[in-house]
């Protein structure tokens, strides 16, 4: 069976350490009754341990060479190997609208986009695990006051409990990346309603962190208008990295009450 050559433009770094693959596979065990979707299986190093769990497993892979390899290596998965771009998929159709666990050795170049899609489908994904760049994992798990605390931290922690599980050395990949990796698990918290307008919440989080050196007074003024009395609140003396998720929710409610003009659509705010 011909091996697949990693493609740089797809951000492929194939995992070759079986112990690490087994450890990643075991992170899905917190939801033993749910089906599993693996993103970016490559040559199936992680897949081989997922299928042993005797659960419905589907894999989605955009690389046609990897798909051909998987179909030959895992004939029992034939009907569940999906050649597609995960970011463009309708996840409602995957398991007939039922929830599932998301996992994978995620490509570095789209990991943030994967997690934004997870947030858009949070009612379908009660648990997301997998391996990403260590720096991104630290950002997601960071708390207020940390230099790595940012947009992903707040948006994900609003809906998920984040666990930084373990760090992975560069040498367990082919080719070795230039940075370390980490395995994380994100589990849906008890939040059903955010307690504020979710679109405005997202807009405020992105707007303030895109100007993270400014105080909230200066970063929010373009939204509220320079003469809005709300900016006299002491909260506006803080910078975004000083605010907890709950404080961002409180801020969103204050801004919503003060707004006199239509809100700029979130789609026009640039992703990090």
UniProtKB/Swiss-Prot annotation:
Enzyme class, first EC level, given as a word: transferase
Keywords associated with the record: Cytoplasm, Methyltransferase, RNA-binding, rRNA processing, S-adenosyl-L-methionine, Transferase
One of the Pfam families matching this protein, by short name: RrnaAD
GO cellular component: cytosol
Family annotation (PROSITE patterns): RRNA_A_DIMETH, SAM_RNA_A_N6_MT
A GO molecular-function annotation: 16S rRNA (adenine(1518)-N(6)/adenine(1519)-N(6))-dimethyltransferase activity
Reaction(s) catalysed by this chain's protein: adenosine(1518)/adenosine(1519) in 16S rRNA + 4 S-adenosyl-L-methionine = N(6)-dimethyladenosine(1518)/N(6)-dimethyladenosine(1519) in 16S rRNA + 4 S-adenosyl-L-homocysteine + 4 H(+)
InterPro entries in UniProt: KsgA/Erm, rRNA_Ade_diMease-like_C, rRNA_Ade_Mease_Trfase_CS, rRNA_Ade_methylase_Trfase_N, rRNA_adenine_dimethylase, SAM-dependent_MTases_sf
Binding sites annotated in the UniProt record for S-adenosyl-L-methionine: 13, 15, 40, 61, 85, 105
Compartment(s): Cytoplasm
EC nos: 2.1.1.182
Described function: Specifically dimethylates two adjacent adenosines (A1518 and A1519) in the loop of a conserved hairpin near the 3'-end of 16S rRNA in the 30S particle. May play a critical role in biogenesis of 30S subunits.
PANTHER family assigned to the protein according to its UniProt record, in alphabetical order: DIMETHYLADENOSINE TRANSFERASE (PTHR11727), DIMETHYLADENOSINE TRANSFERASE-RELATED (PTHR11727:SF7)
Stated family: Belongs to the class I-like SAM-binding methyltransferase superfamily. rRNA adenine N(6)-methyltransferase family. RsmA subfamily.
Protein name: Ribosomal RNA small subunit methyltransferase A
Species whose genome carries this gene: Bacteroides fragilis (strain ATCC 25285 / DSM 2151 / CCUG 4856 / JCM 11019 / LMG 10263 / NCTC 9343 / Onslow / VPI 2553 / EN-2)
């Amino acid at each position: 069976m011909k091996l697949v050559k990693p493609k740089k433009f797809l951000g492929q770094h194939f995992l070759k350490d079986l112990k690490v693959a087994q450890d990643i596979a075991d992170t899905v065990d917190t939801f033993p009754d749910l089906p599993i979707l693996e993103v970016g299986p490559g040559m199936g190093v992680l897949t081989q341990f997922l299928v042993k769990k005797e659960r419905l497993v589907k894999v989605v892979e955009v690389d046609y060479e990897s798909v051909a390899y998987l179909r030959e290596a895992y004939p029992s998965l034939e009907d569940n190997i999906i050649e597609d771009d995960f970011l463009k998929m309708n996840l409602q159709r995957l398991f007939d609208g039922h929830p599932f666990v998301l996992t994978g050795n995620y490509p570095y170049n789209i990991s943030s986009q994967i997690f934004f899609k997870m947030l858009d489908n949070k009612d379908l994904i009660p648990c997301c695990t997998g391996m990403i760049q260590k720096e991104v994992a630290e950002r997601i798990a960071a708390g207020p006051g940390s230099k790595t605390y940012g947009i992903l931290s707040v948006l994900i922690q609003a809906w998920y409990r984040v666990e930084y599980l373990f760090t992975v050395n560069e040498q367990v990949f082919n080719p070795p990346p230039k940075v370390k990796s980490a395995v994380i698990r994100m589990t849906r918290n008890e939040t059903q309603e955010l307690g504020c307008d979710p679109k405005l919440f997202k807009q405020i989080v992105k707007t303030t962190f895109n100007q993270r050196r400014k105080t909230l007074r200066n970063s929010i003024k373009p939204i509220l208008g320079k003469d809005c009395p709300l900016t006299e609140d002491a909260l506006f003396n803080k910078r975004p990295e000083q605010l907890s998720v709950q404080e961002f929710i409180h801020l969103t409610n204050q801004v919503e009450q003060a707004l006199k003009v239509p809100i700029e659509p979130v789609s026009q705010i640039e992703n990090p």
